Amino acid sequence: PPSIDYGFNQLRDPNKYNVERAKELLKREGYEDTNGDGIVDKDGENLVLDFYAYTTRPELPLYAEALQADYKKIGVDLRIKIVDYAVIDTLAQSGDYDMIISSIVTANTGQPVWFLKQYWGTGVETNGSGFSNPRFDELLALGESSNDPVVRRNAVINAQQLMLDNAVALFLGYPKINIVG
């Protein structure tokens, strides 16, 4: 979050929204709309992705609908599946999904290494994404072990940038919550 100084404003996502580039990548992988139905296919099979969301965070189905509209622009049939959070958690840990949307407190301790390791660390049971990168793991270890706050901060920033560079996850937004008393 921007309230914790771990590079929020300096991180750069090289995978910005680009419909034409997405279409090029799909075509390069052999996906084209051969039957004119608006959905790209390969070997006669439409590209259909199941996208799991839950309603205990009311903004998540709205994000899912926005993504569904964007995916339609590139010819991908994104089917939204609304399930209980427990199902999302089970799917996320198993890796048995096409896409999941989740809203998680990313730095509830003020130290983001725990969060990054739990979801993307190599060999961690809760890493259902399958992401494994030795450099990422080294950066997390450095961010966890160093006594120097500058070294820890830079390690976390570099780990996050590595995630963005490798399109490990799609970060859609960061909600601002106000508490008024």
PLM features: what roles do these ranges have?
Residues V19, K23-L25, E29, A53-L67:
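Bilobed "Venus flytrap"/periplasmic-binding protein-like clamshell domains
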Residues D37:
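Acidic carboxylate motifs that coordinate Ca2+ or other divalent cations, activating on Asp/Glu
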Residues D33:
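Acidic, divalent-cation-chelating loop motifs in proteins
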Residues I80-T90:
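Short helix-initiation/N-cap motifs at beta->coil->alpha
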Residues G75:
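Short glycine-rich hinge loops at helix-strand junctions in the catalytic core
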Residues P1-Q10, P14, E59-Q68, I88-G181:
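Detector for C-terminal structural segments
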Residues N46-T56, L78-K81, D98:
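Short, well-ordered beta-strand elements
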